[in-house]
């Protein structure tokens, strides 16, 4: 700042001195009536004044140019500086765009990684769902008792399928293990490539920051900036090539991983299916073998104890439920104990306070309920502990007296005793089916003498209609008493 003041003062003083000297010279030239270049004295004086003024201006500019290098470069190199500044700004803009593109690609890679984690969670959810379905399939095994006859004929096929399924399961397990190893290796490679790409991006960001700082310092380092920018441009180009190569490798790895994971999901699905089939076939085979050997003492869904309960006091309800569970335990002990053994004090049922409280909450409202204790699985003699489940249902009217349960037709003239007996058994089975669907677990009781009814049917000589009707009002607690009637031309001619 002091140098500027001195420079301005020197220019003012020097300009005044030169102007004064020029005026004196012009005055003396005018008085002396000198003539230059054959001009008149007056014109000569004017010319001398012009020359002194030009000298003042030239001296001023010379002092400014000599004293301030920036002013000298600004006057003579202004266009070059502006042109170079525009080029540097364009290069900075391109570098910022490249930086933005790299950040977008990095975000894209992060999104793909997040998608991979989401897919993994979906696979785990599907696996949990498959386990639930497996549990449901185990519960449906109660229906296998009705398929006993068909299972006996298919035993050879089941054993063959079992062995084949075991072989396929082992093969799938080996493939899955190999693919899991390959997937883990590819994931490790992907993480390495991502780390290298991230490192390259961070290095490029640092280079861009240095470049931005160099642009801001262009007034102080203008002479060396061009070379530094060229070096940085070369580094950026190299980094761009490296990033492009890394991105290409990552894309290829991602594609391979996606294919491997897809194949792994297929194999896992196939493995789950084969495991379910193997478990189902093993249970079928075990149930068939136990039935064949006569070992099953309790079957799934068998009623261990039942009672009709109506109370609204928690203590009384708890006492009744405990007594019912004790009765179920005694009945199970009788079924599972070996002949001649003492099983009176053996606790077979897994009874917990939580299950008792759950039953109390279900029936403790003052209404009448039917509570049944069922066997939760198939058990052989000698078992020391079994699972059970309880069922509660309102004890309501299910069938009114004289309500028709099932109907069939028969012609005693053309049917043998065995065929007639089969037709009646089918009628009774249909009645049992309706009773079970309505919630009555107790068996069907035939009201009257069944054999006498069959004998009288054999004596008829015309086609008849046979109906199974409820002998009395039947509630959920049961049992259902059935009366068989034979109808001919709309009239009841026989009845049990």
From Swiss-Prot:
The chain crosses the membrane at residues 45-67. The keyword Hydrolase does not apply. Keywords: Membrane, Signal, Transmembrane, Transmembrane helix. It comes from the Bacteria. InterPro entries: DUF3084. Residues 1-19 form the signal peptide. It is found in: Membrane. It is a single-pass membrane protein. Residues 113-137 are annotated as: Disordered. Pfam families: DUF3084 (PF11283). Coiled coil: none annotated. GO terms for cellular component: membrane. This is Uncharacterized protein alr4393. It comes from Nostoc sp. (strain PCC 7120 / SAG 25.82 / UTEX 2576).
